[in-house]
Amino acid sequence: MDLGCTGSKFYETPNIDRLAQDGVQFTQAYSSCTVCSPSRAALLTGKYPARLHLTDWIPGYGAPDNAKLKIPDWQKFISSDTTTLPQQFKSAGYSTAIIGKWHLSPDAKQSDNYSPQKYGFDINIGGNHLGQPGSFFSPYKIPNLKDGPTNEFLTDRESNEAVKFIEQNQTKPFFLYLAHYAVHQPIAGKAEVITKFEEKNNRNGQKYNATYAALISSVDDSVGKIRETLKRLKLSDNTIIVFTSDNGGLPKVTDNAPYRDGKGSAYEGGVRVPFIIYWPKANSNQSTQSTPIQSIDIYPSLIEMTGITSQSSTIDGVSLAPLLKSTKALPTRDLFWHYPHYHRVGGARPYSAILSGDYRLIHFYEDNRDELYNLAKDPSESQDLSNSEIEIKNTLKKKLDAWLKSTSAQLPLN
């Protein structure tokens, strides 16, 4: 994992680690998909990607030549009849802003039709159809983000824009979606920070990616800058902070151990993510939570924590507020994933999955095959139990099939 608070001895994230100490860190947190666009849509709507029919990164790779199945005709935007989190807050009188990555528009030609402004954001700085920047150094080659001085670093620029927004709205409620393009490709970092980590590698005889470490450091610096701004403006005691990621780490760039594989895969390494919530009203006696949660839970949690009235009828996530405030256990539930696509980098082939208690079942559509793992005993998913735990496998498969039907999930085609 890439953070000090998740066990890294190489990456340096003192500000994120401090946020984890001051807030609540969830040690079994999941994104709603193994790739970015669906996870972001799920976070902003509280709905599973399967229900949204937005199930791959935009525009997606398509099926490879050796594909056995056809990809369904999936949707590359959030439907206009879906109420988003920024729309909820805007209706409640909040100023709303997105700074950074949007990646929920079909393409450049339709970017304006599906821009963040159409979904409740008053201010949009840098959000468009792109999933990654042209460069992390100015000129950025990002539509609707004015270039800064030559070689200005993108994460720093996004952080400075966030500080400006907070300062401008310090006397009224605000909702800020700071979606850094980091740590996405193209992996880049400031030269002096890269050198620092190269020297650290040399001292310790390690071979970590120093450039990636520098990029992570830029995000950590951003967290520190945001928290310092809130403290300076005396807003810390009245502000909720959520820190998470949209998918697991990129294979070959980072190490998701002990979890198997990474972004774009069917396994834990593709969907296990850091997740920290800072809420001044949370129970101060807890700093970690082992309850399994998913990014769809952010939507109902923020609605309840802020006390605004929800305008959305169907929400798949559950509020974490009771758990955070009193350590009251959440209702028992299963978590689900659906990816009817092919991913060139992570290796995923069309699959659906369910987490039920300690067990995770993955159904692969190409050969109608199931894999079953006990994550409590085997977090690295190295021992498939599908042939030995038949009853559990069948029970989970029935639950998965029922969920797919209830969400009208689009299945891969023969």
Language model regions located:
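Loop/turn elements at helix/coil->beta-strand transitions in domains of secreted/extracellular proteins
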Residues: 22-27, 92-97, 119-122, 169-176, ...
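C-terminal cap/loop subdomain of S1 sulfatases and analogous C-terminal strand-loop tails that border
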Residues: 122-123, 249-255, 261-268, 283-284, ...
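Histidine-centered active-site microenvironments of extracellular/periplasmic hydrolases
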Residues: 110-119, 187-189, 228-282, 294
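A short aromatic-rich beta-strand->coil structural motif
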Residues: 1, 89, 101, 162, ...
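Short, solvent-exposed turn/loop segments enriched in Gly/Ser/Thr/Pro and often Arg
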Residues: 5-9, 25-47, 55-61, 98-110, ...
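Active-site-proximal N-terminal segment of extracellular/periplasmic enzymes that hydrolyze or transfer
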Residues: 1-24, 383-391
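A short beta-strand-to-alpha-helix junction
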Residues: 8-12, 30-35, 72-83, 148-158, ...
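Formylglycine-dependent
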Residues: 54-95, 102-176, 180-192, 198-204, ...
